[in-house]
Amino acid sequence: MNETEFHQLVDSQLERIEAAIDEAGADIDYETSGNVMTLEFDDGSQIIINRQEPMREIWLASKSGGYHFKSIDGEWICSKTGLELLTLLKQECDKHADEPIDWV
């Protein structure tokens, strides 16, 4: 994948994340600045999602640790867990919120 394709795929994934948060009605503030999306929770904890251009990966950092995702067959798959990005992100958001979020 070239650089343009990578950015289009990441932008699309970040939009999916925003839509999932909005649809869930979750009390999560999010902001995207440059290559970084920050999710902030009531207790001040954060999840950071950023694109790593040289590696063509998306990285996620949370209080559980760091995760690297590669695009495989149209999905962003974690090299550590094998989970898809949105699946793992939802689990991490539940942990940060200290309660289950009603994901749609």
From Swiss-Prot:
<dbReference type="InterPro" id="IPR036524">
    <property type="entry name" value="Frataxin/CyaY_sf"/>
</dbReference>
<dbReference type="Pfam" id="PF01491">
    <property type="entry name" value="Frataxin_Cyay"/>
</dbReference>
<dbReference type="InterPro" id="IPR047584">
    <property type="entry name" value="CyaY"/>
</dbReference>
<dbReference type="GO" id="GO:0005829">
    <property type="term" value="C:cytosol"/>
</dbReference>
<dbReference type="GO" id="GO:0016226">
    <property type="term" value="P:iron-sulfur cluster assembly"/>
</dbReference>
<dbReference type="GO" id="GO:0008198">
    <property type="term" value="F:ferrous iron binding"/>
</dbReference>
<comment type="similarity">
    <text>Belongs to the frataxin family.</text>
</comment>
<dbReference type="InterPro" id="IPR020895">
    <property type="entry name" value="Frataxin_CS"/>
</dbReference>
<dbReference type="GO" id="GO:0008199">
    <property type="term" value="F:ferric iron binding"/>
</dbReference>
<protein>
    <recommendedName>
        <fullName>Iron-sulfur cluster assembly protein CyaY</fullName>
    </recommendedName>
</protein>
<dbReference type="InterPro" id="IPR002908">
    <property type="entry name" value="Frataxin/CyaY"/>
</dbReference>
<keyword id="KW-0408">Iron</keyword>
<keyword id="KW-0479">Metal-binding</keyword>
<comment type="function">
    <text>Involved in iron-sulfur (Fe-S) cluster assembly. May act as a regulator of Fe-S biogenesis.</text>
</comment>
